[in-house]
Amino acid sequence: GVRLSRFVQSVTRDFPTSLLYKSFRNKRIKVNGKKGVPEDRIKAGDLIELYINDEFFPPEGAKPAHKPAPKKQQNQPKVTVIYEDENIAVLYKPTHLLCHSDRTGDANLVDAFTQYLAQKGEYDPHGENRFKPGICNRLDRGTEGLVIAAKNYAALRDMNEIIRTDLLKKEYYTITVGIPQSGRFTAWWEHDEKNNKVSIHAHQSQDERRKQIITDVDVLRTAGPFALCKIGLVTGRTHQIRAHLAYLGRPVLGDIKYGNRKMNERTGTKTQALCAVRISFLDIPEENTLHYLSGKVIKLKEPQIVKQFDGLDKSRQEAVDVS
């Protein structure tokens, strides 16, 4: 029979490898009503269910096996490598850079990383490669910070397992509108997938569809109505930081979806002030090929968000001096 992961790739278009494996983890790919795994072999008569965004499927009537029309050529940005070994690299993603390619053809981190490896002679984009280097943890387009990239299939598989079993912890810096309390906050999260928007609630719903979220907040500095905060994710869900802080009445500065529109306009901030600054690996099992990362901490030394906060503080002080 055909390997399930290969079948899914054959009927989708522009579906990133990292999202493919995330879909397996999140039970969005099923065989005969049960959770599928990439290694499953499927045969005639099997019922395959794919709960995947429509954008990754060819238009009705098109042949999925055919390649899509070429995208506009795009020079990829130079990759900033924070850490690298033979299996993975930890990259810095600036604000506005996509993680994966989309139909706009805009520059993206995956293609930039692939180009970087090709220039080093570690990857042949024109060869008969079954595996294309991919990223393991996605950041929203407007979020900057650390992203883990896999150079080979085993690294991608095992890093996804590390993430799935919560053996990797991430910390963020953010600037909030309003000064939050420091502490651990718990709430209930619900995702409207159609509109890609999250709502946060104090209690579980009757149908128990909501999922619990836990967010750690540590206020590092304040400047008037703004706070520079360190955020720790005990759980990691879509838009968790942005939506949870908005629910607490202290939204992320520059957040168009959940934020304070007036303050965004007043400060001229057009994207969310959020940066993934630190990745910590816990005790990884010996059978995992990335076991050697156990206990390793990777940090972003000079996050742009700190300079952004310094600018807000300076502007506030100048306004006080003038008055």
Would you name each region that the model predicts?
Residues 1-323:
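RNA pseudouridine synthases
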